[in-house]
């Protein structure tokens, strides 16, 4: 089973034209796991951005925007609505500008700490053949 099983459609909004081919490569890899319809658009296409967000249940920032060396937020308040779930894969800082904005708009939010730790757990399993104590790590480092 795939994490995207049951998802009707995914819109990927690419912020840099130089990575357009990488976007298509990602779509090809995702199709190996799911029959989900996946489309690639330019983030700079504001009309498409608005249309995509209007139909979305989940928004995920998978860029480096939000880290200390690339601060900021790619979305504006007028694009968000309270029923959206907004996830930011940036884990430092925990409360990125996107997370702050989404909370102020009434959205449910997911910060990057969980995905960061889960990625580390997968790496530990693959490389070292052991299970990382995810709950302990989350409690120790993130107070969760």
Residue ranges and their predicted role:
Residues 1-3, 59-62, 116-125:
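Active-site-proximal catalytic alpha-helix in oxidoreductases
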Residues 3-9, 104-108:
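Conserved S-adenosyl-L-methionine
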Residues 6-34:
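NAD(P)-binding Rossmann-fold cofactor-contacting core
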Residues 21-24, 69-71, 119-122:
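Short, charged, surface-exposed secondary-structure boundary motifs
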Residues 89-144:
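Adenosine-phosphate binding glycine-rich loop
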Residues 28, 32-35, 58, 65, ...:
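Generic secondary-structure signature for well-ordered alpha-helical cores
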Residues 36-109:
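Rossmann-like adenosine-cofactor binding region
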